[in-house]
Amino acid sequence: MKLSRIIEGLEYISNAKLDTLDEVEIEGIAYDSRLASENQIFVAIEGETVDGHDYIDKAYERGCRVFVVNRNIKLPEDSVKLLVSCSRSALSKMSNNFFDRPSEKIKVIGVTGTKGKTTISNYLKSVLDESGMNTGVIGTNGIFYNDYEGKTVNTTPESYEIHKTIRKMVDAGVECVAMEVSSGGLMMQRVNDVNFDIGIYTNLSPDHIGPKEHPTFEDYRYCKSQLFKLCKYGIINLDDENSDYMIENADCEIKTFSIEKESDLKATNITLTRSEDSLGAEFDYIEKGETPIHTSISSPGEFSIYNALAVISTCECLDLDKEKYLGALSKAKVDGRVEVLPVLPYATVVVDYAHNGMSLENVLKTLLQYKPNRMICLFGSVGGRTAIRRKELGEVAAELCDVSILTTDNPDDEDPMQIINDIAECFHNSKSEVIKIVDRAEAIQKALEIATDGDMVVIAGKGHEKYQYVNGERVFYDEKGEVINAAARILKKNN
């Protein structure tokens, strides 16, 4: 593709003449010098710990001769320099152009909020697929479409990877993609040039605030709101206290859903259900001026109802067959989200991704409605993040749990025991028994060993993840595998 076509719409200052830009043939875009090669554009991005401008010489050695920079630095004479105000924004626009604006050729649904993004995105894939709309997913659990499964490093990948993935989906016959849109992805302008048809807002709590993420809650909230400047339709949880802010800052048509307030789509008559391998809920929902409709889902709690309402609202926007999408929604499940593992015949074991105070509180309060004999909860907190998350997790467990097993989550380069001790500070006036075990596998073994008839064991924090970050390295770790193996050892010993 000609360079002039790739940089179409980009504001820049260049050392090259216009006819030169028309003549240069480009085969790819690189933003990592290790992946750079001949006939590629190298985009120098200033990251949190690494500055791409420091690796321009490496990209040059690997054959790059076109460089996008946001500092007026000196380059070799045979190089084309494109000076821009923001290289991240430039990468987004160029990636969109390079892959021939793929998001204009597919329905794109963006999901943002502190919690619910993964569940809603995966619900949408299940429901839309069964409704006859071939759908893909980009998010925390990975990239999925047709028979393809791929991994993602970030919840919302870099803009080049997004447009590349959507291009592949379009070429593979995918008609719709549900994408998790994180505040970081919005802040780092990864989705600037994605053509969103629908944006969904779930909720907001003071998470992802700290030196490595958002400096303030106001910045976090602002970044979330930017999705609704990129959409045709916005679907908003009206019960969330920040919903008015999202609506006021939106540039799109808004539809609302709720359980408490009057909205375009409201749930009523909620009841919990239970089977051997599933916890769920039934409810009625009412569209303005319509007759109530009864439906069910295979996940418990109000937060699951909110997720379901977001999916129903989306299906209505897409004008899908009600019978098909409600039938699919009733069966939909998400890996590692309030997932019951039927490993002990006398106790209920649940694995969940809850890793902040708001999520853990929602999960525990929902599960307590099933009136377990004891609530045993295993959890930890990540390293390198604001300490407030540890406090919030600890306070929730101190209030709601009979036994709290504090262990390792993703300690990164922090001392795991220090993180555990920080959480333990919240239990001074609590009736909850506290057990500290650094090794997460050993902690799981302990949690299942102490479980007795009617107890509920919640293993929180990892869910679907197959890794831990320890000492700056990503190491393999399979939460569900550890639970299954621990239970097998216990049952073998008991027999």
Pin down the residues of each PLM region.
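Phosphate-binding loop of NTP-binding sites
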Residues: L10, L91-L238, N242-E253, L309, ...
